[in-house]
Design a protein with these regions (language model features):
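Structural motif corresponding to the early beta-alpha repeats
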Residues: 22, 37-61, 82
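Short catalytic-loop micro-motif centered on adjacent basic/acidic residues
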Residues: 15-22, 111-115, 137-138, 211-213
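N-terminal binding-site loop/beta-alpha segment at the start of enzyme catalytic domains
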Residues: 1-43, 74, 100, 106
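Hydrophobic residues in well-ordered beta-strands that form the structural core
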Residues: 17-18, 47, 166
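Glycine/proline-rich, positively charged
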Residues: 10, 52-170, 180-184, 190-191, ...
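Structured C-terminal cap/extension of enzyme domains
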Residues: 7-9, 13-14, 33-35, 130-132, ...
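Short beta->alpha linker loops
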Residues: 22, 26, 118-119, 217
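Hydrophobic/aromatic residues located in beta-strands of well-ordered beta-sheets
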Residues: 43-45, 113, 164, 212
Length: 250
């Protein structure tokens, strides 16, 4: 992981997303170890409060302080209430979680307070309206734009003035290979571009997007994403048409 982090930082990647349960609870310690040799101001670190582990109000402080230690940092640039839905919204209110995170922000331990989301647009509207959030993380890609309410969720965030952090832009890797027919449509439009890069660019082309997350398991995937974003251009009208044509036969 240290070599991967070094390659990312050296090539302009500066937003690193982790969470308490990722990789068998080892993601935060691994990332903390890998990042500690770099100046703290050279990267943005995002982690998340594990909502489903909270059994009482005091657990908020317990997990938050533990996460700072695990990541070997004094503050999180972005801190999210993890996987918010209707049930966890009730917990958020009952345990006064936003108020506690706002206190940590006053203390300089959090720079920006947000949440990641997995529920309906109606629930998203309710959560956005309840507190002065600064950003939100949603699943968005060119399949889920209509199929899974991503368009409606994106527009809710836009209306509330909340920048969107995009997760699953390549839909768990599914949009890295669309099958022979759709792949050929995209290759005719741009012979050099990887199929996955179309998905990354689709998400990054939206104006209210703060950053696009991408889970990468190989240096080749990292290199492809670096190239895509280093040379980034929003999708043109012709490219959008090619993507629509590919989707028709997907």
């Amino acid at each position: 992981i240290e070599a991967t982090v070094a390659m990312a930082l050296e090539n302009g990647v500066n937003y690193f997303d982790t969470a308490y349960p990722y990789h068998g609870h080892q993601s935060e310690p691994f990332l903390g170890q890998a990042m500690k040799k770099y100046p703290r101001e050279s990267f943005y670190l995002a982690s998340k409060l594990p909502m489903w582990y909270l059994k009482k109000e005091a657990d908020v402080a317990r997990y938050f302080e533990e996460q700072l230690e695990r990541c070997q940092v004094e503050y999180f640039d972005f801190y999210l209430c993890h996987a918010m839905n209707e049930e966890r919204f009730q917990m958020l209110q009952e345990y006064h979680i936003f108020e506690k995170l706002a206190e940590y922000k006053k203390q300089g331990k959090i720079r920006h307070i947000g949440f990641s989301f997995h529920d309906s647009p109606e629930v998203l509207e309710k959560i956005c309206s309840a507190y002065p959030w600064e950003f939100a993380q949603i699943q968005l890609n060119y399949v889920d734009w209509d199929f899974q309410d991503a368009k409606a969720q994106y527009e809710i965030l836009e209306r509330h003035g909340l920048p969107a952090v995009i997760m699953e832009p390549v839909r768990g890797g599914a949009l890295a290979d669309l099958g022979e027919g759709p792949n050929q449509v995209l290759k005719r439009a741009d012979q050099k571009a990887s199929i996955a890069s179309w998905a990354i660019r689709y998400a990054a082309s939206l104006p209210n997007v703060l950053t696009v997350l991408s889970g990468m398991s190989t240096d080749e995937q990292l290199a492809d994403n670096i190239q895509t974003m280093t040379e980034f251009q929003p999708l043109s009208a012709d490219e959008r048409e090619a993507l629509e044509n590919a989707l028709e036969i997907y």
